[in-house]
Amino acid sequence: MALVLVLNSGSSSIKFQLVDPTAHATDDPFASGLVEQIGEPQGRVTLKHAGEKFVVEAPIPDHSAGLALAFDLMGEHKCGPTDVEIIAVGHRVVHGGILFSQPQVITDEIMDMVRDLIPLAPLHNPANIDGIEVARKILPDVAHVAVFDTGFFHDMPPAAAIYAIDAKTAADHGVRRYGFHGTSHEYVSHKVAELLDLPEGAINQITLHLGNGASCAAIRGGKAIDTSMGMTPLSGLVMGTRSGDIDPGIVFHLHRQAGMSIDEIDELLNKKSGVKGISGVNDFRELRTMIDAGDQDAWLAYNIYIHQLRRYIGSYMIALGRVNAITFTAGVGENDVAVRADALSHLEGFGIKIDPERNALPNTGPREISTDDSAIKVFVVPTNEELAIARYAKALSGA
């Protein structure tokens, strides 16, 4: 079996999957795992393979040691590089800037270009680079492919991509809307075309990637024309711990009046805001339990979340003019029945009708949750970014 190793390297973790790029979207990966607590006194590698789970705990000083330990564990359980045919390695890279609209076979020149983008993603791209460098050393004889989170939004119309600030300042410092979760939005939009049995060029759709991070996209004829995240993943929808859209003047106010540093405000808006900032929790299952128990802060957090979601859905319906489908994906979007119903509950005037029984069905795969006579189809489509990355990697590797 020809497999692609898919890596998602974070600052202190590495997610990995061995994926058959020809597999069905609902198939489990051949193997998957997580290296975590890199740089801490005690790290952990978890591997899932053949219906079993294996865990090793050991010091993991850096990404190189973490990936080596993961490969050792995979080898012990007959799914390592010497046991299976790895035809390519696909790497998730968060920020491609204006340089990359498509996945790229990684060369030394491409690596230099990705390094140049670190100022745009100082929390993410360095970790992505670490993972690529380590993997290229361990697997030097296969193609390594970078798939950029921003790529799908690269060619948005200027009216959506350009911020109304001094043009020279923006150009000098790379300030514009880049968008994120692009691999997920693109993957889901392809699935919607299959569900509608229409060519993508004939479809206008809104995709809602609702996880701890959340974003939405307006897609016309297979091309993104707008998205909620901006220069960074902080803007747009209310998220688990991120504020989403706020008045930029709040940053100045907190700096001047509260004496908060830029780093403190960064931490506040990225890690201590959103649903967690209002309710104290960012897990929607916990939030629902608190709401059911009568917790008013939880109820307020939920209402703010839904209010912002409706605002974006409504504005994208106007931007698109005609909408064939609205689709929910990612952890909250795929599993939270109430969020889906409430997000669309004030849009009946557009002819959107949710079927409560269909909406309440468990998350078993792509499915329609609107009524047969709904003017706009509503779908739930489980995202599979790893499979999308694996398919890109296979295609570009020539294997």
Swiss-Prot record:
Amino-acid positions noted as binding Mg(2+) in the UniProt annotation, renumbered to this chain: 8, 385
Annotated gene: ackA
UniProt similarity note: Belongs to the acetokinase family.
Gene Ontology MF: a single term: acetate kinase activity
Swiss-Prot/TrEMBL cofactor(s): Mg(2+); Mn(2+)
CDD domains the UniProt entry points to: ASKHA_NBD_AcK_PK
Keyword Magnesium attributed: yes
EC number: 2.7.2.1
Active-site feature positions: 149
Species annotation: Corynebacterium diphtheriae (strain ATCC 700971 / NCTC 13129 / Biotype gravis)
Compartmental location: Cytoplasm
InterPro entries cross-referenced by the UniProt entry: Ac/propionate_kinase, Aliphatic_acid_kin_short-chain, Aliphatic_acid_kinase_CS, ATPase_NBD
CC annotations in GO: cytoplasm
Keyword Transferase in annotation: yes
Primary site of residence: cytoplasm
UniProt remark on cofactor binding: Mg(2+). Can also accept Mn(2+).
Subunit details: Homodimer.
Pathway involvement of the protein, from the record: Metabolic intermediate biosynthesis; acetyl-CoA biosynthesis; acetyl-CoA from acetate: step 1/2
Sites where the protein binds ATP: 15, 209-213, 283-285, 331-335
Name of the protein in question: Acetate kinase
Binding-site list for substrate: 92
Top-rank lineage group of the source organism: Bacteria
